[in-house]
Amino acid sequence: MGMKFQKILVLAGIVIGFLSIIVVLAGTLLKNSVPNVLAPVERHFAFDYVIVGGGTGGSTLTSLLAKNSNGSVLLIEAGGQFGLLSRIPLLTTFQQKGINDWSFLSVPQKHSSRGLIERRQCLPRGKGLGGSANLNYMLHFDGHGPDFDSWRDHHNLSDWSWAQMRSFMAAAKPKNPDMLEIPRRYSKLTEALEEAQAQFAYKDWIFRRSLYNIRNGLRHSVVQQFLNPVIHHSNLRLLPDALVKRIQLAPSPFLQATSILVGIKDEENREKEFSIELLMASGIGDVSALKKLGIPAQHSLPLVGHNLHDHFNLPLFVSMGVTGPTLNQNTLLNPMTLINYLSSGSGPLGNFGVLGNVVSYGGLGAPPYGITFFGAGAIDESALMSISNFKGPAFRALFPRYYNSSQEGFVVISSCLQPKSRGSVGLLNRHMRRNPLIDPNYLSSEEDVACTISAIRSAVELVNSTAFAALHPRIHWPRVQECSNFGPFERDFFDNRPSDQYLECLMRHVGLGSHHPGGTCALGSVVDSQLRLKGVSNVRVVDASVLPRPISGNPNSVVVAIALRAASWILKSELQAGDSK
């Protein structure tokens, strides 16, 4: 009877799987069916607000203006709708390098990425409504007050302290049931983290189980949270699959944007939201750099494109001597995995596998760092190499048991939360959408190396603790040929105390960026305290490029909060203008 029931379950899994594939394909075919599209006859209309880019900031801002403004709103987006595939959390990586990803690559890195092809990092950026919020790993961050206070203290931004931003961060947080928190008893790994929290209570470590922007097993991005509820409003129009090529400035009497070139059409408008590459292509930036590209300068802002920052990670694989459950190929191919997901939105398909993290915000001058726990035992070689740009030997050194489809384990990811390294973004030529020159300049600061080593040492302390002992963990120190002079030596596999030189070598060979870029249109240097482009009266920048310093966590929620605040200023200005008439 048991075997018969099992066969029925297997058959049911196959049938449901087939039906789900049909649904996904149908969603993919319908992905460009954007509602409320700007009609050809409307292309000569004047809009009160034009928002360029439907990413996290753009979608949030569009929602608030369409809902609360008396003016007309046009949202221009280079892509269309993401398909249903993007809604399934565990399939996030399959969205990268696809039609909804700009698929940028960094320039060859000088201080890192030696184990990557051409020493170039993959830099996914979303193309479509929701932008990178439909490519990211859906992790929510409540914010860290000292991040904002440092803007106030070090960048003369008195309007951006935690006291001013706390309410906007709270408003950015989705309410139940639009959030998923990993349960304490989700797996043996989460149970170990729970025990470690009690064991290390004397340390300054903060333990967090992952919070996801997931509802009923589906990604709940800014599209679902903000844009969809207003998408049919009469004062809103959308223009998908459209590239903005240039914004035109003119003095009247102050310098302001007067028109934008979209494809072959000009759309007149009053208030606009833009970002870095478009600014450069429009002749706004460093005049000498623009001249070399043959771009006529309209407005001098020398710091456009500078101050690029991003988090940088070192992943380490830890095998377990017990059954997880952790993500591996056998788990994913089990029919019950699909049945559980389709029936209740639960199980491995219902989140991305990041189960929790541990952070130290530092003290007595120590830099803050984070440790993330990704519950994956078997890493698919072709999938990860495609989205990471790893060379084969580097991947196989990091994940020596990748070929074992039943491998149990997890990946511990160490990173510096406030990296000091700074890079830049520039244009290869005057054509904006050619692959831009993105140089994160990872690990150019020795402080970042020291900070990440501290994170790794703490991660090892956690894995070696009695709280993790029941997992029978074993850290697999990568055998990277170029690092062999420094380790790993046999003793390193017993005491888990490899040298700093070895850890630094690992970082510079197999470390990866976090895809958290920001800073290139920074508050205080490129935009003013109300996000207005300096010297231009009616252009604001509302995305992660305005962050003057890194966020000590995932930045998506902070960008939502920034957009909420920008909307409050814009709506207040509209109200004041109405009162003065």
Curated annotation (Swiss-Prot):
The keyword DNA-binding does not apply. The active site is at H516. It is found in: Secreted. Pfam families: GMC_oxred_C (PF05199), GMC_oxred_N (PF00732). Its EC number is 1.-.-.-. GO terms for cellular component: extracellular region. Residues 1-26 form the signal peptide. GO terms for biological process: protein localization to rhabdomere; retinoid metabolic process; rhabdomere morphogenesis; rhodopsin metabolic process; visual perception. FAD binds at residues 48-77. Keywords: FAD, Flavoprotein, Glycoprotein, Oxidoreductase, Secreted, Sensory transduction, Signal, Vision. InterPro entries: FAD/NAD-bd_sf, GMC_OxRdtase, GMC_OxRdtase_N, GMC_OxRtase_C. It comes from the Eukaryota. Glycans are attached at N70, N156, N404, N464. Its cofactor is FAD. One of its GO terms (molecular function) is flavin adenine dinucleotide binding. Oxidoreductase involved in biosynthesis of 3-hydroxyretinal, a chromophore for rhodopsin Rh1. Not responsible for the initial hydroxylation of the retinal ring but rather acts in a subsequent step in chromophore production. May catalyze the conversion of (3R)-3-hydroxyretinol to the 3S enantiomer. PANTHER family: GLUCOSE-METHANOL-CHOLINE GMC OXIDOREDUCTASE (PTHR11552), NEITHER INACTIVATION NOR AFTERPOTENTIAL PROTEIN G (PTHR11552:SF188). Belongs to the GMC oxidoreductase family. This is Neither inactivation nor afterpotential protein G. It comes from Drosophila melanogaster. The gene is ninaG.
